[in-house]
């Protein structure tokens, strides 16, 4: 997934 440590919120569902 394309995630940053500072943007985990939108990432949680993208992983």
From Swiss-Prot:
Keyword Transport among UniProt keywords: yes
Coiled-coil ranges per UniProt: none
Gene Ontology molecular-function annotations: lipid binding
Superkingdom field: Eukaryota
Electron transport keyword on record: no
Protein keywords: Allergen, Lipid-binding, Transport
Purpose of the protein: Plant non-specific lipid-transfer proteins transfer phospholipids as well as galactolipids across membranes. May play a role in wax or cutin deposition in the cell walls of expanding epidermal cells and certain secretory tissues.
Family: Belongs to the plant LTP family.
Name of this chain's protein: Non-specific lipid-transfer protein
Species annotation: Solanum lycopersicum
